[in-house]
Each structure stands twice: as structure tokens, then as C-alpha cells.
Amino acid sequence: MINITGLNKSYGKKKALDNLTLSIPSNSIYGLLGPNGAGKTTLISILNGLISYDSGEVTFFDLPLKKNLSAIRQRCSLIPQSLAFYENLSVKENLQFFAGVQKIKGHTLKDNLSYAVETNRLSSMMDQKSATLSGGQKRRLNIAIGLLNNPDVIFFDEPTVGIDPESRNDILDTIKAYKSDNKTVIYTSHYMPEIEKICDEVAIMNAGQIVKQGSISSMVNNEESQQVIVELYPHSSTYLSAMSRAEVTIVDQTTLLLTQSSSELIAQVLHQLEQQGIKIKQIRYGATTLESLFINLTSKGRTDV
């Protein structure tokens, strides 16, 4: 569906995207994760034709983006984090206005409007002023506006910001249902439970590159991604602080947490402890969470882009 190969984008001397390669399958909900400055906004802006890129190749539906930008944009929709409608207008007036902006008319308008309203359960509030809607209802109106062109690909940017847990779950269920309507969803969020609940696959970005991608289960259940807990006997050594780095967390004086289980890292840590005369009580494996994996993969190389 969406194939990105060797994508590069710089702002002056700062590289926002660095030879980024990614494939997003059709009819899936794909999570895009990354710390601030990882390049997510730049990537989403490129995919929506809002900014150009320096080099590389992007295709939608096997069509090159640069040569087919207008046709591709008609099949995509970006639903922003900020509320993009007029609060002084009713729900119906907002939907009609934005349909007019997109020049959607006739039977197409009727069908698309019906789909947008029904999937977001707005039928009972069509004549209500948008300013009087609850936080969750405003979010649903925001989504409905983004569905007026009946897109094949929907980009969601933090769609549940600032709403209560019940409304959040309601919106997530709505988004999950779009997959069964043969739509592809690209979903960005900093809230890991959301990603785990609705996404089929995830890509983790850092410093303009994809550092990990695949299904969440394959990521967290990968043998080398497992956490290793090293429990120590009480000791008076001050050496532990020198061992702290991205892969090794000093929980306390008697506990180390290794955020990956490679035999090389384990052997290195055990050798260092032995050299310092620190005795090991036990070593055990713990389950890795998406959040701990994310922190481990993105703890270095952050930029300001």
C-alpha cells in the first residue's frame, strides 16, 4: 500500500529523515512512535503532500507520490490533533461547509456524509452548535470531517488528546472499525496503551530513522528484547553508577535491569560485577513492555527537528 524507500529530508544542516525505509500494509492500523524530534511530523507531512523531500521514493497504491500527488491526496485524509472546525456553526453546518470546500456533491456527498455521521454517532446532534459538544463529541466531529472524502488512507495525529478515558476508548473502538471497512490507518500517539490496543503493527522512529518495526507481539516477545533482572547480594561498592547506560538501569544497590537479553551484554555485565567483587544472588528474565522497548531504542540520538 504505502512504500517508502531511502527517504531523506533536511532543514538546513539538520537531517530530519535519514535514509528512512518503511512499508505500511493495506487494510491495517499502523502505529508510528517516536520521541519529539524523531521526524514523525516531517514524515507525516511528506506523506500528505504538505512538504517536499530531498531524495528517496514514496509510493501509494503502486503510484509514485511526486507524479500523482493530486490523485493520491484525494484518497487520503489527515485528521489533526487540533480541532479543525468552526464552533459557532452546528455539526451539520460544519460538515456541509467542509464538504463544499472539497467540492463533494450529489450522491457522493449523501453517501459520504451518511458514513461519516453514522460511524461517529453524530446523528442526534446534527443541529447542535459545535461549541456545546463535549470533548469526546468534538473529537468525533473532527474525525467525521476527515471522512467526508471517504478516504482509503487515514492519518490520525494524537486523536484522543484532552478527553476522558471513556470517550478515549469510544474513539479507539471507532477507529478500529475502519479497518473492517478496508481502510488503512496510520496512527501517531505518545500514549502506549492506545497503540497496544488498536495497532496491528508499529514502527519506532528515532533520529530520522526507523529503529524497529513489526507486530507488537513480535517486538516484545523477541528473545533479545526481553528484560533481564540481575539481583545482587548487599555490598558497599560504589562502582554500580559507572555501569549505568542505555541498556543497563541501576534500580537500587542490589538490582540491575538489563533492557535487552543479548548474551554479549549479559556476559559483559557479569564480568564487570565479578571484577568488582560484587556477588550475584540470581538472574531472572522479565517480560518486555512496548514502553520499555521504546525507551531503550530512543534513549540516544534525539534531535530538535
Where in the sequence are the language-model features?
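Conserved ABC transporter NBD signature motif
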Residues: 56-67, 71-72
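Conserved ABC ATPase signature
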Residues: 129-133
